Every structure is written in structure tokens, then in C-alpha cells.
UniProtKB/Swiss-Prot annotation:
Cell wall formation. GO terms for biological process: cell division; cell wall organization; peptidoglycan biosynthetic process; regulation of cell shape. This is UDP-N-acetylmuramate--L-alanine ligase. Its main location: cytoplasm. It catalyses: UDP-N-acetyl-alpha-D-muramate + L-alanine + ATP = UDP-N-acetyl-alpha-D-muramoyl-L-alanine + ADP + phosphate + H(+). Belongs to the MurCDEF family. Pathway: Cell wall biogenesis; peptidoglycan biosynthesis. ATP binds at G125, T126, H127, G128, K129, T130, T131. PANTHER family: UDP-N-ACETYLMURAMATE--L-ALANINE LIGASE, UDP-N-ACETYLMURAMATE--L-ALANINE LIGASE-RELATED. Its EC number is 6.3.2.8. It comes from Actinobacillus pleuropneumoniae serotype 7 (strain AP76).
Length: 475
């Protein structure tokens, strides 16, 4: 391990006067990834979170000092404190650090420091960035380039969401939710799409959000590369403002890397990419949906422009196991009314839910789609209420869970009852509101039919609930 750390230090200068780094919210996907990379670089890592889980256990086993609960004394000995976006100035550890004159920085500022002496590839966008980051990471790994990667979700092929590589490459998911991606200084940036989300960060102004993406892309050096989705109207609107080399990808005839002849069979997608030089590349993709073909083509475009051979690109995509909680098959189960398939998916924005439903319809044409949906945040439910009503009305049967608040106070008219009422009034599906999740299995058994595909959809506790359901069904 020491020889590996010495190799890294030759590649990347160490942060002087920094010995111990403390993470508040260390169990979060993005925070844990950075902590793991820095731990493997040889820094002392400590951190706290409100609850113990698999991530905190793994970090503790790797050598991090992990505290459960936030206490002022937890920051003792820290050279710098990294706080997740969910942590505010009232946190006792933040207050203690500031009183002790210990620097308190955002997650993205630490990621930017890791990226500063590396060849950075940053993936941004409202949807698809976790999967696209994972795909690029696996392509570079397949090409024997041993990249460092920091992802916002599990890279299933690697079995983790972060890895410290011995090369100069760093592939990272860039977070627009708090505009902290502006700290990053990559060599290559990908923008998958831009839609209104996390609008509190941008004062409710979509124009401000678009301008922030332009600033992010202008962080590229003049010799950098922006890889942008030609199918997204907003992305194409800002492309002329970037002032850097831009390459596009998508189904659009105007795309530089153009997708043709997409077909889906079950979990696999088959299509052709036409490259800027006219080269045609036939792709077998091991995850379903046109949205994943877009993600994969963004990854392919980055890899081609960076000089990676087709063989490595195609092998990585054909073997890609997906990102955690992205159309994640939990299994097939025999229930009283027949055999069903249970899938867990993180999508919590109407566009994400829509593409998940479309992927299910394309790959399993003869199956009914039964959705267990848990709205995520009252503010998102309010801001995108009508879109949710339209999208959720596409399924054959709908079970609605209560809103996962994520720390927000309830908003009148933006709860699950209101969603159910509006969906019912549209007349396409009659939703069932399940407030007590202990009753979910019983309710499901009353409505499911032989051959159904059940989608557990959302970013909150619905994943834990659906996995618990799967375990009980296995028994």
C-alpha cells in the first residue's frame, strides 16, 4: 500500500498542512467516495453521520474514524472539515470547526482539489450523470488506464462508487443541485440535459440555472472539450455561449455522434453510432432504454476523443452492469396471483420516471407495469405537480407512498393525497395511497397479476422498502 501511495504522491502533490480530514455526512454517496479516495491516498479520515449503514461500516473497516451523530468534539484534530450540502451552519461540528479556525469547505471544493493535478472528466446534467460517469469509468478501466473515479452512486461493475487509480485520469459526477460544480476545473465536461430541478438554488429562475451551466463549461481550458447532448433543447441553446470546442451526441440528425437503429430486447439495447468521420460502430449495451443509449454514447464520444480503442469501449458497454438503483432488478418472485418481476429505480423527476416506464414498455411489451411511487421532497412535488400527474398516469397500476420529505416541511396541495386525487381525475389509472408501508406487500398481492413488472420508483426510502419486500418474498 505504501508503494502505491508513494506513486500517487509523485503524480499528485499532497495537500500541505493537511493531515486529518473530517467529513460531516460521511455516509452520503458523494461524500463517502471522496473520503475513500483520500483515505487510500494516505490521509487520516474521520467523519460523522446520523445513522450507521453499509457505507459507514465499510469506511470504518478501511481505517476511517466514523462517529454516529453530530457532536462538537468529533472535529478534534481535523485540519479541514468537509460538509455535505445537507449540512448548515447550525450543525454543532460546523460551529466547533469555525470556533477552532478550522477551514470548512463544500464537498465539491475537496473534489476540485483532487481534480486539480489530474486530467479531469466531469459529468453534469439533470438526469443520467451517475450512469454516464459509471460508463466512462468502466471504459477507462477496460482500457487499462486505471482511472480514479468518484461517482454519486454505486458503479456495479466495480462494486463501489469510488476508486483511487494510479493514472492521471479522474472521472467525476458534477453536482448542479447547489451549483457547487462551479468549483471544478476539468479538461472534459459532459452535459447530458438541463431541466428545472433544485430551483431553490437558482432563485426559481431557469435562466439563472442555464447561465450557471455556461459558467461550468467555461471552466474548461481553451483546449478543453465540452460533450453535449444534441437532443436536449436547452443544452443546444447554451452551446453557442460556451466558447470551447463542443461535440454533440444523440438521436438528432445534427449530432456529431449520431445514434441510429436503436432496438431493445429485455435488458439489452442494440444500436449503431455514426461518428464525425463517418465511422459506424455497432453497440451492444447491457442496460435498457433509449436514455441509456444516450448515456453510453456520451461515454463513447469522450473515449473516442481521448483516443481509446473501439475494442475497450465496446467491451465495457457490453459488460456494463449499471449504476446502483438504476433499473436494478431485485428478482422474479412467485406470488399468489402468479410470477412477477421487481425492479428498483432511483428516478424521482418526471423525466426520469417517464424514461424508466418507456424502458419497461420497450423491453417487456407484454407485461403490465405496476409502479410503487414515493414522491421526493414537497418542493419538487409542488414545482412539477402537473408533470408528475401526466407521467404517473401512464402505468397500468399505481401505488402511491407518502412524500419522502428529505427534511422539508409539508406544503399544502403538494402531498401524495393531492397527487392521487389529480391522477384519479385524469381517468387513466386509479392510484392506491399506502400510508403504512408495512401494508405494502398485502396491497400488492391484491392487485398484481401473473407476468407483472413492478417498478419501485423514487429517491427516498422506497429502495429500502422494496428490498425488504424482496427479502420477504424470497422467504
Amino acid at each position: 500500500m505504501k508503494n502505491f501511495q508513494d506513486k500517487i504522491k509523485k503524480l499528485v502533490p499532497e495537500m500541505r498542512r493537511v493531515n486529518q480530514i473530517h467529513f460531516i455526512g460521511i455516509g452520503g454517496a458523494g461524500m463517502s467516495g471522496i473520503a475513500e479516495v483520500l483515505l487510500n491516498e494516505g490521509y487520516q479520515i474521520s467523519g460523522s453521520d446520523i445513522a450507521e449503514g453499509p457505507v459507514t461500516k465499510r469506511l470504518a473497516e478501511a481505517g476511517a474514524k466514523v462517529f454516529i451523530g453530530h457532536q462538537a468534539e468529533n472535529v478534534a484534530g481535523a485540519s479541514v472539515v468537509v460538509a455535505s450540502s445537507a449540512i448548515d451552519d447550525s450543525n454543532p461540528e460546523v460551529r466547533a470547526a469555525k470556533e477552532a479556525r478550522i477551514p470548512v469547505i463544500q464537498r465539491a471544493q475537496m473534489l476540485a482539489e483532487i481534480m486539480r493535478f489530474r486530467h479531469g472528466i466531469a459529468v453534469a446534467g439533470t438526469h443520467g450523470k451517475t450512469t454516464t460517469t459509471a460508463m466512462i469509468s468502466m471504459i477507462y478501466t477496460e482500457a487499462k488506464l486505471d482511472p480514479t473515479f468518484v461517482n454519486g452512486g454505486l458503479v456495479k461493475s466495480a462494486g463501489k462508487n469510488a476508486h483511487l487509480g494510479a493514472s492521471r485520469y479522474l472521472i467525476a459526477e458534477a453536482d448542479e443541485s447547489d451549483a457547487s460544480f462551479l468549483h471544478l476545473q476539468p479538461m472534459v465536461s459532459v452535459v447530458t440535459n438541463i431541466e428545472p430541478d433544485h430551483m431553490d438554488t437558482y432563485g426559481g429562475d431557469f435562466e439563472q440555472m442555464k447561465a450557471t451551466y455556461v459558467k461550468f463549461l467555461r471552466n474548461l481550458p481553451f483546449y478543453g472539450l465540452a460533450v453535449m447532448c444534441a437532443d436536449d433543447e436547452t443544452v443546444m441553446e447554451i452551446a453557442p455561449q460556451v466558447g470551447r470546442q463542443v461535440l454533440t451526441y444523440g438521436f438528432s440528425e445534427k449530432a456529431d455522434y449520431r445514434i441510429e437503429d436503436y432496438q431493445q430486447t429485455g435488458f439489452q439495447g442494440h444500436y449503431t453510432v455514426v461518428c464525425p468521420n463517418g465511422e459506424r460502430i455497432d453497440v451492444l449495451l447491457n442496460v435498457p432504454g433509449k436514455h441509456n443509449a444516450l448515456n453510453a454514447t456520451a461515454a463513447l464520444a469522450v473515449a473516442k476523443e481521448e483516443g481509446i480503442a473501439n475494442e475497450a469501449i465496446l467491451a465495457a458497454l457490453a459488460d456494463f452492469q449499471g449504476a446502483g438503483r438504476r433499473f436494478d432488478q431485485l428478482g422474479s418472485f412467485i406470488r399468489p396471483n402468479g410470477k412477477v418481476m421487481l425492479v428498483d429505480d432511483y428516478g424521482h423527476h418526471p423525466t426520469e420516471v417517464d424514461v424508466t416506464i418507456k424502458a419497461a414498455r420497450s423491453g417487456w411489451e407484454n407485461k403490465r407495469v405496476v409502479m410503487i411511487f414515493q414522491p421526493h421532497r414537497y418542493s419538487r412535488t409542488r414545482d412539477l405537480f402537473d408533470d408528475f400527474v401526466q407521467v404517473l398516469s401512464q402505468v397500468d397500476a399505481l401505488i402511491m407512498l407518502e412524500v419522502y420529505a428529505a427534511g422539508e416541511a409539508p406544503i399544502v396541495g403538494a402531498d401524495s393525497k393531492a397527487l392521487c386525487r389529480s391522477i384519479r381525475n385524469l381517468g387513466k389509472v386509479d392510484p392506491i395511497l399506502v400510508s403504512d408501508t408495512d401494508q405494502l406487500g398485502e396491497v400488492l398481492d391484491q392487485i398484481i397479476q401473473d407476468g407483472d413488472l413492478i417498478l419501485a420508483q423514487g429517491a427516498g426510502s422506497v429502495s429500502r422498502i422494496s428490498r425488504g419486500l424482496a427479502e420477504s418474498w424470497k422467504a
